[in-house]
Amino acid sequence: MCGIWALFGSDDCLSVQCLSAMKIAHRGPDAFRFENVNGYTNCCFGFHRLAVVDPLFGMQPIRVKKYPYLWLCYNGEIYNHKALQQRFEFEYQTNVDGEIILHLYDKGGIEQTICMLDGVFAFILLDTANKKVFLGRDTYGVRPLFKAMTEDGFLAVCSEAKGLVSLKHSTTPFLKVEPFLPGHYEVLDLKPNGKVASVEMVKYHHCRDEPLHALYDSVEKLFQGFELETVKSNLRILFDSAVRKRLMTDRRIGCLLSGGLDSSLVAASLLKQLKEAQVQYPLQTFAIGMEDSPDLLAARKVANYIGSEHHEVLFNSEEGIQALDEVIFSLETYDITTVRASVGMYLISKYIRKNTDSVVIFSGEGSDELTQGYIYFHKAPSPEKAEEESERLLKELYLFDVLRADRTTAAHGLELRVPFLDHRFSSYYLSLPPEMRIPKNGIEKHLLRETFEDSNLLPKEILWRPKEAFSDGITSVKNSWFKILQDYVEHQVDDEMMATAAQKFPFNTPKTKEGYYYRQIFERHYPGRADWLTHYWMPKWINATDPSARTLTHYKSAAKA
């Protein structure tokens, strides 16, 4: 996890502009650097480093003697960099995984380069010989990237929007900042005056397509066909590979563990892989909740079963409420379900940073979208409609769950790794017949649970544990985080304020008091930036005004049972 920042064609004092880059210093607490581009006095790179790989030579922008005209600033992990280096016999100057981007680009251009990368990434690549600038982001947007560009060709790029909002430019008093779309790269011409002109924006990969880099990876050959046992075997192979490749780090690894299916599978597989790799330290797992919450109890059971060094983080309602302002500032969003679910992740990340030496943190993000794990999938009118919804959710991850996972951990200088969003695992899962992936017998993620039933990775009661609403998991059904928040905002937002909400917030007008409260905080930090959120996360196929699973009939029935 690092923070990248760059300016092209700035007409303001660069030393003043560079102060904006300090707003993302939390992403890279180990070192930082600003570097002007030779021959372009108004172009500059900024980098905040979290040293995860190659502590000695990992500073950026990356430049190597063989390509003196290439400048690279990137945030990410390229898991297949060694395989590609050996395959094409590239001569490396460092041990940094990102160096592969320079070699691939020189060999085959930007399209082939980005399609060959197995990992998560956001990058800015400058080619001064050919006068080009390239921006790129991974398929699901696991690593963030924002840009601002004016009509006269001033370009600013940053890992987080907060590093751009205060920049100055002569042609506009208000610089429009927007997220760079996942699964895309952009080509821009670099002009002699340091400004740029966009040439093309290209969507290079669809989540359902097998990635090009699959031709060169070391995953054992998959079995053909869609018979259940064949599919289960292939899923186990790909999931093991997804976890194993993410062990690439020089820092200690930990894992978030809620006791739910997804994080438990990741933790169990991770511990198994660490033992096989003969890693000398015990795996630290981390759970958060209020006292005796279902998540804490389930996570404790998993930790005892797999043998991890387990940490439990307790918080109370006051601490949760007090964290909301910091959380919304970190998230750069006012989406209700994202804010709600981020408080626990923010607080546990804070604990990890202050009390342990774990820096690279695994989690189960992405599984609900990929494997149709949300409770409302029980309402899908057909397997095909469920498939469409799953792909829509994956496409929008960068606005919601992936955003939450990145910002809450990066705020405390941690790096998050998400095996369920592995290219090969996810593309294979999405290639399966729609009817195999839907909930069965009233149980969501049935295929995923069935896949690991005979693996002995987890206790059966965890493997088949019903999905909890997040607010219930970290607290209790009787006094959930959802209810705590509703009671609090009832005293913060009155009916008169709600009656005039459309006048005050004409875009994405909040429909609930909780939504109104979050929007107020957001506007205080980021006035006039409401369009960063195109729409609220909301369950489909039901008439919902609140995203909580507690409002779903199926969940209410299960909770009473």
UniProtKB/Swiss-Prot annotation:
Residues binding L-glutamine, per UniProt: R49, L50, A51, V52, V53, N75, G76, E77, D97
GO molecular function: asparagine synthase (glutamine-hydrolyzing) activity; ATP binding
Modification N6-acetyllysine, positions: K385
Alphabetized InterPro entries for the sequence: Asn_synth_AEB, Asn_synthase, Asn_Synthetase, AsnB_N, GATase_2_dom, Ntn_hydrolases_N, Rossmann-like_a/b/a_fold
GO BP terms in the entry: cellular response to glucose starvation; L-asparagine biosynthetic process; negative regulation of apoptotic process; positive regulation of mitotic cell cycle
Active site as annotated: C2
Pfam families: Asn_synthase (PF00733), GATase_7 (PF13537)
Reactions catalysed, as given in the entry: L-aspartate + L-glutamine + ATP + H2O = L-asparagine + L-glutamate + AMP + diphosphate + H(+)
Site features described as Important for beta-aspartyl-AMP intermediate formation, chain residue numbers: E365
Pathway participation: Amino-acid biosynthesis; L-asparagine biosynthesis; L-asparagine from L-aspartate (L-Gln route): step 1/1
Gene Ontology annotations for the cellular component aspect, listed alphabetically: cytosol
Entry EC number(s): 6.3.5.4
Domain Asparagine synthetase: residue ranges: 213-536
Residues modified to Phosphothreonine: T545
NCBIfam families (UniProt xref): asn_synth_AEB, PRK09431.1
Protein name: Asparagine synthetase [glutamine-hydrolyzing]
